[in-house]
Each structure stands twice: as structure tokens, then as C-alpha cells.
Regions:
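C-terminal non-catalytic interaction/assembly regions of soluble proteins
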Residues: 119-212
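Functionally constrained cores in energy, signaling, and assembly domains
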Residues: 7, 86, 105, 114, ...
Length: 212
């Protein structure tokens, strides 16, 4: 309530972390909880505000939308019916992951989100157990593959290029929960151009590059 009384706007999440500090997060940039302390953070540590000594201290981070922008009504993503019948599967890469053991069929599965590790890389050892081969298998079954957990940069590994060449579509600079939510919304809407919804911001979920 203090955030609203202070003039705060938008779809927000307040949470007190284990250090006793209470932050106000933009909901679409909330990351997964830290399992060691059960703390929540904002993507890029760009919080909307902090509640300190009974007062709301708004952030001046340039990567955040202004309160004026947050107060503007947004158009809906679809004019038709919206049912979450299409499923989105979430996978997380780790060194040595054998993708050949995974079988994703089209039974209500529309897409796979694969969370990459360091600088957007994933297992690409060749043979039949790398992510590129997994992408090929998914596409044969009518399932699209997306990558999350990466930012847009010209400096990428050759393995990352190989993954892109096998049809994996990157979702840049959004949290993993936001990436999954966008895909669920896209594949369960009446939109014909799903890529447009995925590449565009719905509600400020994409984190802009930090100004230098």
C-alpha cells in the first residue's frame, strides 16, 4: 500500500529478503527465488523501489519504465478466446546433459524453452545427444525450441551459432519465468504471428542494455 500511496504504478511485487530489505519489483522482471535464502530479485537488479524506514525510495535506474509509462493502459494480446491448453516445457542445460534421453512429442506441447548457461551456450558435443540434434528432433514433431537466459551480443561462441543454425530461437534479456509466460500466452492466443508477440515487449519484461 505504501508504494501506491507514494504514487507508484504498475504490476508490482513487494518482497522482504533475508537481509531485511524490502524491494518493490516489476512483476514481469522478477527472477526465480534464490533457493539458499528464498530471496527474490529483479532482472539485472533493477528494482522499482525500496521500502526503507517507512518510506518508498524510487529507483532512478534508466532501464526501468517511468511511473507515467507504467500507468498507461496496455492493449490485450488477443481478441479471441484465451485458454492455456497448449503446454510449454522448460529445460535447463548443464554440462554433460544427454538430450537423446529426452522425448518431446506434440501432445499439447507447443514449445520448449531451454535455459542456457554461460553466455548462451549449451551442450553441442555432436552425435545424437547435443542441443542442435534435440532441436531437429523437436521440429520433426512440430515443437518449436526457444533459448532463454541470454542477452543479445555480437560476441557469441561457435556452439551458440550452431544451435541457432538448427532453428532454436533466442529470447533475449528476459527472466526465465517471463520467457515461459510469453510463450504460453503466444501459443494459446489467436495470434497468427507468434514471433511478433515473442520479440515485442508485452509489459516491459525485456531489460534494455545498461547505459554507459
Amino acid at each position: 500500500m505504501e508504494y501506491l500511496k507514494a504514487g507508484g504504478r504498475g504490476f508490482f511485487v513487494p518482497y522482504e529478503n533475508s537481509d531485511g530489505k524490502t524491494y518493490i519489483h516489476l512483476a514481469t522482471r522478477l527472477t526465480e527465488a534464490d533457493f539458499l535464502h528464498d530471496d527474490f530479485h529483479s532482472l539485472g537488479d533493477a528494482v522499482l523501489a525500496e521500502f526503507k524506514d517507512g518510506k518508498i525510495i524510487f529507483s532512478n535506474d534508466s532501464r526501468l519504465p517511468s511511473q507515467e509509462e507504467l500507468s498507461k493502459p496496455l492493449s490485450g494480446i488477443t481478441d479471441g478466446e484465451f485458454e492455456l491448453s497448449g503446454r510449454v516445457v522448460l529445460l535447463k542445460s548443464y554440462p554433460g546433459l544427454d538430450y537423446s534421453e529426452l522425448r518431446i512429442k506434440h501432445d499439447n506441447v507447443c514449445a520448449v524453452v531451454n535455459v542456457t548457461y554461460h553466455t548462451g551456450s549449451a551442450p553441442c558435443a555432436g552425435g545424437s545427444f547435443g542441443l542442435p540434434e534435440f532441436c531437429d528432433e523437436c521440429h520433426k514433431n512440430g515443437v518449436d525450441v526457444y533459448l532463454a537466459g541470454l542477452r543479445k551480443t555480437d560476441d557469441i561462441y561457435e556452439t551458440s551459432k550452431q544451435i541457432y543454425e538448427h532453428g532454436a530461437e533466442p529470447i533475449y534479456s528476459v527472466s526465465v519465468p517471463a520467457a515461459v509466460s510469453k510463450l504460453r500466452a503466444a501459443y494459446n492466443s489467436s495470434l497468427k504471428n507468434i514471433d511478433t508477440l515473442i520479440s515485442n515487449d508485452i509489459y516491459y519484461e525485456s531489460l534494455p542494455q545498461e547505459e554507459k
